[in-house]
Amino acid sequence: MEYQNRFKDNLKELRLEKNLGQVELAKAIGVSKGVISMWENGLREPKMYYLILLAKFFNVSIDELVGIN
């Protein structure tokens, strides 16, 4: 899925902009580091619930998070 490629890149970029490790982000939204790693490597897609949490955490829209212009 094309949005998945944009999402994984956007997620990693947003995380690094905040100087967060995968463990810190995982704790902030209630998932494991492995889940963050799978999302960032495009091995798994987040459920809508986590997209909402991530968008709120990074103060961006879901559209921005998944790369919909």
Predicted regions and their residues:
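Alpha-helical residues within the helix-turn-helix
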Residues: 16, 27, 56
